[in-house]
Amino acid sequence: MNINQLISKVKSKIEKNISLEYINIEDKTFLHKSHKTHLDGKFHLKLIIKSSEQKKINKIELTKKIYKILDEELKKYIHSIQILIN
């Protein structure tokens, strides 16, 4: 899976499972290419969302929900993910 496919899949899965006002996903893999632990095919993503759900549940619970939604992608394709909830 390439980065564009991964971003598309992540965005789609989150949009289907969380009520969003805004979502932006950035590829930050280039910041980690020189690290010893960098693996080809594993990506670093920055996820920025604004959700009406955060009014119902706190940021920690929303973050847990995102991790559950992206479980497969985290195991196979995502080395690290930064989640910003506005």
Model-identified regions with their sequence ranges:
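N-terminal, polar/charged subdomain of small-to-medium soluble alpha/beta proteins
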Residues: M1-N86
